[in-house]
From Swiss-Prot:
Name of the protein: Rano class II histocompatibility antigen, D-1 beta chain
Source taxon at top rank: Eukaryota
Extracellular topological domain residue ranges: 27-226
Native source organism of the sequence: Rattus norvegicus (Rat)
Positions on the Cytoplasmic side per record topology: 249-264
Length: 264
């Protein structure tokens, strides 16, 4: 589990990191179109049995130096970060504070948030569809879309006629939605044959059992017949509804008429 710093303790550490940034870290042109970022991350493994704190400096999407609590000091990621790493590592009091962040910030915040974050689960939504519409026996890409789930641990497997497919798989990798949910696309490259059944199976901690969604390879004529059948049923129901409406309206009109003899 990874938490980005949004609370007061870790945010204070990030603020201190920014204030202590050496001038050498900004040797490039600091015009508005460039972006400097500092990210504090608490990594938890099996609760708080093992906790790792990272302070990452990023310039224009490129990380150039970082503090790693497992290492105990700053290490340069690129040549740009070497002067910064050397500068920070000489600040003894500051380095002691960073090394203590695992206990003073990460573990502290975990205890506060554990009750509502760790047990939280959201079931994934699973859909299967071909990437393009074309006749059978042509190369196609079947897409299994797994969306809006939490936590991020998920396993997606493809089957053809009950046999697992391990070749021809393409995945987008885990995508963060920004609202504590994730999404993932796992695609299968194949040449569908008539009558074949493709199944996407999804396993996730929120599910009591795996979810299986099927896609059946059908010829264009079979699909047209199926759509014609569905259209016929819908049309029949419309005529039936119209007939019942006319019938009950006539019945109501007749019940409202009184016999002529009673008017005299």
């Amino acid at each position: 589990m990874v938490w980005l710093a949004r609370d007061s303790c870790v945010a204070a550490v990030i603020l201190l990191l920014t204030v202590l940034s050496p001038p050498v870290a900004l040797v490039r042109d600091p015009t508005p179109r460039f972006l400097e970022q500092v990210k504090g991350e608490c990594h938890f493994y099996n609760g708080t049995q093992r906790v790792r704190f990272l302070a990452r400096y990023i310039y224009n999407r490129e990380e150039y130096t970082r503090f790693d609590s497992d290492v105990g000091e700053f290490r340069a990621v690129t040549e740009l970060g070497r002067p910064s790493a050397e500068y920070y590592n000489k600040q003894k009091e500051y380095m002691e504070q960073l090394r203590a962040t695992v206990d003073t910030a990460c573990k502290h915040d975990y205890e506060i948030s554990e009750s509502f974050l760790v047990p939280r689960t959201v079931e994934p939504k699973v859909t299967v569809y071909p990437s393009k519409t074309q006749p059978l026996e042509h190369h196609n890409l079947l897409v299994c879309s797994v969306s809006d789930f939490y936590p991020g641990s998920v396993e997606v497997r493809w089957f053809r006629n009950g046999e697992e497919e391990k070749d021809g798989l393409v995945s987008t990798g885990l995508i963060r939605n920004g609202d504590w949910t994730f999404q993932l696309l796992v695609m299968l490259e194949t040449v569908p044959q008539g009558g074949e059944v493709y199944t996407c199976q999804v396993e996730h901690p929120s599910l009591p059992s795996p979810v299986r969604v099927e896609w059946k390879a059908q010829s264009t004529s079979a699909q047209n017949k199926k759509m014609s059948g569905v259209g016929g049923i819908v049309l029949g129901l419309l005529f039936l509804g119209a007939g019942l409406f006319v019938y009950f309206r006539n019945q109501k009109g007749q019940s409202g008429l009184q016999p002529t003899g009673l008017l005299n």
